[in-house]
C-alpha cells in the first residue's frame, strides 16, 4: 500500500505572482487528478474562516450608552462608527490584547491614523475614514483590540459570558468582527501535463489580505493549519504500527514464520495445514500425542517434524502466552 502512495505525484512547482502588496496569485502543480479541488477547497475554507489575526472587538465612546445613539457634531451615527471600526486593519505584534484610544475635536475628518497606539500595535490602513466632525463635534473613544481566530460573534460572547455581561460597565459596545486577515479567496483548477500524462491538475489560488500579512504568508499558515489537523490521523496509524511491532517483538521471529519455511515433506505439510497449523508458533504448542491423532500423520512424519524443530532450537509442547499476536497475518 505504501509503495503506491510513494509513487503518487507531488507538486514540484510553486509560483507566487504578486499583483499588489496585498494581493497575489499562487500556482501549484502538478497534482494527481482530483487533488486540485481537494486541496483548493480545503485551503479556501481555512483562509476564510480559520486564520489567526487581530481586530477591534469593543468600543467605549464618551456620551454613548448604546449603539443606537447619535453624537452631536458627528455626521455618522454610532452604528456607522462601529461599522467603520470593523474595517480598521490593525496588527498586534505584542500580546493577545491591547487598548488604544482616539480623541479628536472638529471640524475635521477622523481616520484610522488618528488612533493613538501604545507599544506593539500597527495600523495598516491609516487613511480609512472613521468619522466626520463639524465645529461642534468631539469624539473620544477607547478601543479594545484582541487576537483571535475566525469570526468574533457578539451574540455567542453574551451567551457564554452572561455573568460578566451583567457586571460590565454600561456603554461598552461589543463589535462583531472577523479576525481573519484574508478578505477574498478564489481557486481555479486547470489541466497540467507531465511528459505523457495529461490527466493532472494545476491549482491556482487568488487571494487578497488586509495587509496585516502578505498573501504568501497566508497560504503558508493555512497549509500549516491543515497539516496540523490531519497529523492526528498520521499519528494514529503510527501508534498502531508501533503497538503491533511491540506485540510481535514479544515472540521469537521464527515463531511468526509459516510452517512452509520448515521445508517438510508434502505429506507432513498437508497434514499440518489440515489441522489449521499455519505458523511455527502454532506447531510448537502441539504435543506428540496431539499430532499423532492427526489423520495420515504417522511416526515417521512426527520424527521429521521433531528433527526440523530441533535444528531451530525449538520443540513440541512449548507454552506461548498471548499467542497468537493480534497482528499475525497482516
Swiss-Prot record:
One of its GO terms (biological process) is DNA-templated transcription. InterPro entries: DNA-dir_RNA_pol_insert, DNA-dir_RNA_pol_RpoA/D/Rpb3, DNA-dir_RpoA, RBP11-like, RNAP_asu_C, RNApol_insert_sf. Residues 251-330 are annotated as: Alpha C-terminal domain (alpha-CTD). Gene3D superfamilies: 5' to 3' exonuclease, C-terminal subdomain, DNA-directed RNA polymerase, insert domain, RNA polymerase, RBP11-like subunit. Its EC number is 2.7.7.6. This is DNA-directed RNA polymerase subunit alpha. One of its GO terms (molecular function) is DNA-directed RNA polymerase activity. Keywords: DNA-directed RNA polymerase, Nucleotidyltransferase, Transcription, Transferase.
